[in-house]
């Protein structure tokens, strides 16, 4: 599994509600989200979650017409990070990630990996 993960908002919220957010830190060396995801999440983040702005907004802008802003920013950041894993559950976002060659996992898959 990759050492870096980029997370979408819904996955952060789910793991937080289950009190399992710590799993990300146990499985990955770097956990990154975008400022858009931080805003959607709306909670204080732990220090080990890095907020990283997307540098090249081209993919994010293109994706926003089909998927949520947070998901679009997560995919764009995953493109920039390279060799990372993206955690997302939305089907449209998963299809976009697949088309762009990005490896992803869902929240359920992440829980299975943590087991």
Please state what every model-predicted region is:
Residues 108-115:
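Short alpha-helix plus adjacent loop in nuclease-associated cores
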Residues 2-84, 91, 100-103:
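Active-site-proximal, substrate-binding regions of enzyme catalytic domains
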Residues 75, 94, 111:
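Short glycine-/small-residue-rich flexible loop motifs, especially phosphate/cofactor-binding loops
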């Amino acid at each position: 599994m990759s050492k870096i993960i980029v997370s979408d908002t819904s996955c952060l919220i789910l793991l937080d509600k289950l009190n399992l957010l710590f799993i990300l830190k146990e499985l990955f060396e770097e956990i990154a989200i975008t400022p858009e995801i931080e805003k959607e999440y709306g909670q204080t983040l732990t220090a080990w979650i890095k907020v990283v702005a997307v540098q090249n907004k081209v993919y994010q802008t293109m994706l926003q017409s089909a998927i949520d802003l947070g998901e679009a920013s997560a995919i764009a950041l995953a493109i920039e990070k390279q060799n990372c894993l993206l955690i997302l559950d939305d089907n449209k976002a998963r299809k976009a990630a697949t088309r762009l060659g990005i490896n992803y996992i869902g929240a359920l898959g992440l829980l299975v990996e943590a087991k």
